[in-house]
Amino acid sequence: MKRVLSVLVVLMLVLSVSAIAMAETVEEALTAAASMSNEELYEKAKEEIAAGGQLNFYSTTSFAEKAASNFMEDYPELASKVVYAEIDDGETYTILTSTIGSGVKDAADMALVQNGPDLKTYLLDEGLSYSYFPESMKDVVDEANQNPPVITFINSLLIYHNGNGSINLTNVWQLTEPEWKGKVFFKDPTKETVNLNFLMMLTSPDWSVRLEKAYEDYYGAPFQSNEFKNAGYAWIDGFLKNVNYTYTSASKIATGIASGAPGNLGLFVFSKLRKVDEADRVNLTVVQFENEVEGFSGFMYPVYATVANDTECPYTCALFINYLLTEAGFGGEKSWNSNQGYYSPNKTILKPEDLQDEPYEYWSTRLVFEDLHYIDENYAEAYEFIAVRVG
């Protein structure tokens, strides 16, 4: 009898070790999910939910909550099992790095985050989260937007109070002139990472060359300086000298300019116009809709999806990301696509014709785009330069 029990114990240990060896890691599951159909992923997701799983996801953009609601309607057996929590950009990576793998209840299974350089540094490079992108979408999303996967682009534009008529802004170097002192509203870049990343991109070779051209067009002479490394640094210096930091959020900048002094201008998130009282919206003009601007008309930044390395529902995460990359997940009433200032990386998803906006392709040549690799490699020098001038 003892021998039989010993054999059974050994067999159980062998089976247990085999089960562990056969257990699929999150990374392996996401790799497998990339080539599956949505129907196959749904079956896998139902298995995860039946086993007690729940997809908790954090997002820096509130429209993700509506997308999650639509997702559960389209996949009814996942109803109430996709739980949204809004997270502020400034605390995103502090929360995620401290909770992923900690066993904290309702920690994120996936997140929609901005600030690509921090995503790379604190999560992806550390193996705390993984990128996932479906093979079925590779023909409609540019390769540059697949790893890490972009869910939406958001733009910030130059917008002004038109109470005194046009400000005739045709060149970004105008904003470095003394006449703009205190009249340009911009959120403190040391407290708003996408604003910081925008300024850092201006120091890159491509953008400094573009600013050199704008400089020569405006001043009638080539850019020359012994003080600044390139035209990007020079523009940042002049611009920040004029910035007014009274307002601490994009929504407050939008409403403050709309109800404030004519002639004031802000560089803020375009979609925040929805926060402005309807009676005041007539006071606001998007510079780019009035005329072309030498240099740029604002900037564009991505929101990425990333999957936590300890999620118990990787297939559900994959299905949800697939959904967000489609018209069903990105569009509809009260969605990203029904509002100004949000653009899908899926080139087949177009902005509604009745919306005062332009497609992604239009903005792609007029806005400064975030390059997470350039920022990651040049962060220290550019940050010090900017922080000193913010004061």
Label each PLM-derived region with a short phrase.
Residues 1-9:
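Positively charged n-region of N-terminal signal peptides that target proteins for export
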Residues 54-72, 83-97, 105-258:
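Extracytoplasmic ligand-binding site segments that recognize negatively charged/polar headgroups
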Residues 24-34, 39, 361-391:
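Conserved C-terminal helix/tail region of periplasmic/extracytoplasmic solute-binding proteins
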Residues 117-122, 264-285:
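A ligand-binding cleft/hinge motif common to bilobed small-molecule-binding domains
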Residues 6, 15-28:
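Sec-dependent signal peptide cleavage junction
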Residues 299, 303-372:
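Mature extracytoplasmic/periplasmic domains
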